[in-house]
């Protein structure tokens, strides 16, 4: 993919406006996870080291436009950045008509979603953002699938528009996995429903050599192959769709599974009741009417791990079992370790996948971990990300 990169630009004395994803969780006035802030720091520091006058902006939460509320302010983020950067980071609430910032300084602009027209990508608002800067840097991959004034609109009107290091790294990794994958390529796609991952499955079936499915998605594929899935989560209306996908790409199915008696499960306290449920390993052909499949069995986990060992590219989206409960997490654990130990280039994305990576402590052994949730899935689906498309246009 051809786009301008912030790292290639001369920023000395330039006014640089950086769109980051600083949408951090806040509880009782405390930031509960600073992961997104830590991810943004290298970009901000790099712009400062290049001698830029830096302005950073982001959204936080889902405020009603034009109705700013203190709990949705970026004030806590400004305090965090002040400490992390070792210099004062002032928060500007009134900035659309201009901001005073000098080379070597960084300021934070208040929550973009306080501005009427932000979400609808109002061109007048986008032009006001663009007028603040000499260079606009899009670095928020997590919002790249949204055409908003601070993501797509400003990039259209700014004198220069470039990708920041975070966004560039995401696009390079996704391009390597999806556009120029080294073969054989294996994708792991798991989740509760085929319907929510249908575009992902269809897209990957045309690219990868083998498609490992897990969770409720795997149950639908098992039903399509004629197996009884008992009380397991599956989508009867998508059995034919599963057959069509399996006709296009090799989909290795589980040969054994881990089940629980559905009558022991309280669906109003699903994870709580599962913790007390007995896990039973069964051959897939032995699943009974009252069984609920909650993980792949050890034989299947070993077979899937062997597939991953011989692959050159791995794309991973979703755990293959209810890994939050240990007796139904062995399959996801085995696959996590197999991805980590493989020599393949691996890319992982999606909230549950990241939680599994954290649980099994393999983050350092994954080639690239995508920060982008919905944007990651839309890229994998083959959809155009508006904030990326404008950077490609302007390159």
Curated annotation (Swiss-Prot):
<dbReference type="GO" id="GO:0004618">
    <property type="term" value="F:phosphoglycerate kinase activity"/>
</dbReference>
<keyword id="KW-0808">Transferase</keyword>
<keyword id="KW-0547">Nucleotide-binding</keyword>
<dbReference type="GO" id="GO:0005829">
    <property type="term" value="C:cytosol"/>
</dbReference>
<feature type="binding site">
    <location>
        <begin position="350"/>
        <end position="353"/>
    </location>
    <ligand>
        <name>ATP</name>
    </ligand>
</feature>
<feature type="binding site">
    <location>
        <position position="36"/>
    </location>
    <ligand>
        <name>substrate</name>
    </ligand>
</feature>
<feature type="binding site">
    <location>
        <begin position="59"/>
        <end position="62"/>
    </location>
    <ligand>
        <name>substrate</name>
    </ligand>
</feature>
<dbReference type="GO" id="GO:0005524">
    <property type="term" value="F:ATP binding"/>
</dbReference>
<dbReference type="GO" id="GO:0006094">
    <property type="term" value="P:gluconeogenesis"/>
</dbReference>
<keyword id="KW-0418">Kinase</keyword>
<keyword id="KW-0067">ATP-binding</keyword>
<comment type="pathway">
    <text>Carbohydrate degradation; glycolysis; pyruvate from D-glyceraldehyde 3-phosphate: step 2/5.</text>
</comment>
<dbReference type="InterPro" id="IPR001576">
    <property type="entry name" value="Phosphoglycerate_kinase"/>
</dbReference>
<dbReference type="GO" id="GO:0043531">
    <property type="term" value="F:ADP binding"/>
</dbReference>
<dbReference type="GO" id="GO:0006096">
    <property type="term" value="P:glycolytic process"/>
</dbReference>
<dbReference type="InterPro" id="IPR015911">
    <property type="entry name" value="Phosphoglycerate_kinase_CS"/>
</dbReference>
<feature type="binding site">
    <location>
        <begin position="21"/>
        <end position="23"/>
    </location>
    <ligand>
        <name>substrate</name>
    </ligand>
</feature>
<comment type="subunit">
    <text>Monomer.</text>
</comment>
<protein>
    <recommendedName>
        <fullName>Phosphoglycerate kinase</fullName>
        <ecNumber>2.7.2.3</ecNumber>
    </recommendedName>
</protein>
<feature type="binding site">
    <location>
        <position position="197"/>
    </location>
    <ligand>
        <name>ATP</name>
    </ligand>
</feature>
<dbReference type="Pfam" id="PF00162">
    <property type="entry name" value="PGK"/>
</dbReference>
<keyword id="KW-0963">Cytoplasm</keyword>
<comment type="similarity">
    <text>Belongs to the phosphoglycerate kinase family.</text>
</comment>
<feature type="binding site">
    <location>
        <position position="113"/>
    </location>
    <ligand>
        <name>substrate</name>
    </ligand>
</feature>
<dbReference type="InterPro" id="IPR015824">
    <property type="entry name" value="Phosphoglycerate_kinase_N"/>
</dbReference>
<feature type="binding site">
    <location>
        <position position="146"/>
    </location>
    <ligand>
        <name>substrate</name>
    </ligand>
</feature>
<keyword id="KW-0324">Glycolysis</keyword>
<feature type="binding site">
    <location>
        <position position="324"/>
    </location>
    <ligand>
        <name>ATP</name>
    </ligand>
</feature>
<dbReference type="InterPro" id="IPR036043">
    <property type="entry name" value="Phosphoglycerate_kinase_sf"/>
</dbReference>
């Amino acid at each position: 993919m051809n786009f301008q990169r912030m790292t290639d630009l001369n920023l000395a004395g330039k006014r640089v406006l950086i769109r980051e994803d600083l949408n951090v969780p806040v509880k009782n006035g405390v930031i509960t996870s600073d992961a997104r802030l830590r991810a943004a720091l290298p970009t901000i520091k790099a712009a400062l080291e290049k001698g830029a006058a830096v302005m950073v902006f982001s959204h936080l939460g889902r405020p009603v436009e034009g109705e700013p509320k203190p709990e949705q302010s970026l004030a806590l983020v400004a305090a965090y950045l002040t400490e992390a950067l070792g210099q004062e980071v002032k928060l500007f609430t009134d900035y659309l008509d201009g901001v005073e910032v000098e080379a070597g300084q960084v300021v934070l602009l208040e929550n973009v979603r306080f501005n009427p027209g932000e979400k609808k990508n109002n061109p007048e608002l986008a032009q006001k953002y663009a007028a603040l800067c000499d260079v606009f840097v899009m670095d928020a991959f997590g919002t790249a699938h949204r055409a908003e004034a601070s993501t797509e609109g400003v990039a259209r009107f700014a004198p220069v528009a470039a990708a920041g290091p975070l966004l560039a790294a995401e696009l390079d990794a996704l391009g390597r996995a999806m556009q120029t994958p080294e073969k054989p390529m294996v994708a792991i796609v798991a989740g509760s429903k085929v319907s929510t991952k249908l575009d992902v499955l269809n897209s990957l079936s045309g690219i990868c050599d083998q498609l490992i499915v897990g969770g409720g998605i795997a149950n639908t594929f098992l039903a399509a192959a004629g197996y009884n899935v008992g009380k397991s989560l599956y989508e009867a209306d998508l059995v034919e769709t599963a057959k069509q996908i399996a006709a296009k790409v090799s989909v290795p199915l589980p040969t054994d599974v881990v089940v629980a008696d559905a009558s022991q499960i309280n669906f109003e306290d699903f994870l709580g009741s599962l913790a007390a449920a007995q896990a039973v390993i069964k051959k897939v052909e032995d699943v009974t009417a009252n069984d609920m499949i909650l993980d792949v069995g050890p034989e299947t986990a070993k077979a899937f791990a062997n597939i991953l060992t011989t692959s050159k590219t791995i794309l991973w989206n979703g755990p293959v079992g209810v890994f939050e409960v240990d007796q139904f997490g062995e399959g996801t654990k085995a696959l996590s370790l197999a991805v980590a130990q493989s020599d393949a280039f691996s890319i992982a994305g999606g909230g549950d996948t990241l939680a599994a990576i954290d649980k099994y402590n393999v983050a350092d052994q994954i080639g690239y971990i995508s920060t982008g949730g919905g944007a990651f899935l839309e890229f994998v689906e083959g959809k155009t990300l508006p904030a990326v498309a404008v950077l490609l246009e302007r390159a």
